[in-house]
Amino acid sequence: MLVTSLIALLPAIAAAQVSGTVGPRTSASAKAAEKVCNVLDYGASANSTIDIGPPLKEAFQDCQTGGLVYIPEGDYLLSSWVSLVYGSGWALQLDGIIYRDKNVTDGGNMIFIEHTSDIEIFSNNSAGAIQGYGYLFHEQDEYGPRILRLNNVTDFSVHDLILVDSPAYFLNLVESYNGEVYNMVIRGASMGGLDGIDISGANYWIHDVEVTNGDECVTVKSPSANVRVENVFCNHSGGCAMGSLGTDTNISNIEFENIYTYNSTQMYMIKSNGGNGTVTNCSFKNFIGYSNAYMLDLDTYWGDESDGDGIKYENIGFENWKGTSSNGIQRSPIRILCPDANPCTNITLTAVELWTDTGDYVKQECSSAYGEGECLRQQNGTLASYSFTTTITSVPVTAYSPTTTMPGLISTSMDTTTSIPIPTIPTSFFPGASAYSTLMANM
C-alpha cells in the first residue's frame, strides 16, 4: 500500500551524544503528496522477469527534487546496479522484494545513494527486502557488491527494511550526517568481510536492529562524532566494534547502550595497531552477552600496524556488563591493551561482571591502561608502560540471569553455500525494551 499518512515523526532524542535532530526534514507522506513515481509506470515488472534498474533510475529522476519513488509489493529482478545521486526531498518506498540477478557478478554497490539530503528509505509494510544471493560468491571464497551504500548524505533515515545474504557489506554509511537507522534485520553468512552496519560521519541514531553475519554487527569508523547506538541484537554475528583504526583517527562522543550479543566474535572490540589521532568521550553501557569469543576488548595491537606511536584513547567508560565468554581461559573476557608509547587514560569499568562457559576461572589483561576498575592502574603521576594479567576464580553473582534471554537465538552458523531465507522484523531488540518506533506494518 502506498503511504498515505505521516510515516516518520522527526525524532526528539534525549540522548546526550546526538547533537540536534536526525532523520529527514519532511515526512514521506508530504513527499508523496507532491509527487509519486511508481516504478511500474516506468516499465518495471513485479514478477522478477525484467531488470528494475533502469525503471528505478527513471522514476528517481522524475522525483529527485521532491516526491516518492514507489516499488509496490511483488518480486523484482536487479541486473544493473543503481546510482541515485543528487536531488533532495525524496523518499524510496520499497514494499516488494528486490533479488540480485544470479547471473550478474559485478562488484560495487547494488544501490548507491550520494550527495543528497532530506531522504527516507523504507518499507511501508515492514516486509520490503533486498536479497543479495551472496552465497554464490561466498561458496567460491569471493565477494561481490554491497547491498546499500550511502555517501555524503544529510538528514536521512533507513528503516523497516530487511537486507539478506549480501555478497559484501550490507549497509555502508560513509561520511554522512544526521542519519537515523531503525527497525531493520540484517541476515548474512558466517564469513568475514560481511559487515552489517558501518558508520562514519556525524550525528547518527542507530537503534532497534538485529544483525546476523560473520563480521561487525554495528561498527564505528573514523572520522565519526556524536553517534548513539542502542537496542541492538547481535545474533550470531561478529559483534559491535570500533575500527580498525589507523592514522589520523578522529572519533568522539560515541554511545552504545542496550546491546545484546549471542554466539558472536565479541561483545565489543576497539581495534587498532599503531596509528595516531584520538578516540575520546565514549560510553558503552548495558551490555548482555553469552557464548562469545571475546567480550570487552580494547586491543591496540590488532591487525596490521599503521604508522605512528598509537592512538590516544581517553575518557572511555564501560558500565553494567553481564554475561559469559565461550572460553574465558583461552581469551580473557576483559582485555584493555593500550599503546606503550601512548597509554590510555581515564578508562573506567563499573559493574562489569563477566564469566566463562568453559572452565572455572577467567583472566583479565591490562597494559598501559589507566583509570578505575578491574586490572586498570590508577593515574598517579607518570604514565609508565606496564603489562598485568590477573586470574579471577569467583563467579560473579549477576553474570548469569534467567531473565536476560532473547527469542530467536541463532546457535548455528549461516551457511555460505546455500540461500538464506528472508526473516521478519521483530518488535524488540533488547530484553525488556520495546522498539522506539512502531513497525510501519502495525501503524
UniProtKB/Swiss-Prot annotation:
Active site: D215 (proton donor)
Keywords, comma-separated and alphabetical: Carbohydrate metabolism, Cell wall biogenesis/degradation, Disulfide bond, Glycoprotein, Glycosidase, Hydrolase, Polysaccharide degradation, Secreted, Signal
Signal peptide positions on this chain: 1-16
One GO molecular-function entry: rhamnogalacturonan alpha-L-rhamnopyranosyl-(1->4)-alpha-D-galactopyranosyluronide lyase activity
Location relative to the cell: Secreted
GO CC annotations, alphabetized: extracellular region
Glycan-linked positions: N47, N103, N124, N152, N235, N250, N263, N276, N281, N346, N380
Disulfide bonds: C37-C63, C217-C234, C338-C344, C366-C375
Keyword Nucleotide-binding: no
InterPro entries named in the record: Glyco_hydro_28, Pectin_lyas_fold, Pectin_lyase_fold/virulence
Enzyme class: hydrolase
Enzyme Commission numbers on file: 3.2.1.-
PANTHER family per record: PECTIN LYASE SUPERFAMILY PROTEIN-RELATED, PTHR31736
Family: Belongs to the glycosyl hydrolase 28 family.
The protein, known as: Putative rhamnogalacturonase D
Organism encoding this protein: Aspergillus niger (strain ATCC MYA-4892 / CBS 513.88 / FGSC A1513)
Organism placement in taxonomy: Eukaryota, Fungi, Dikarya, Ascomycota, Pezizomycotina
Gene: rhgD
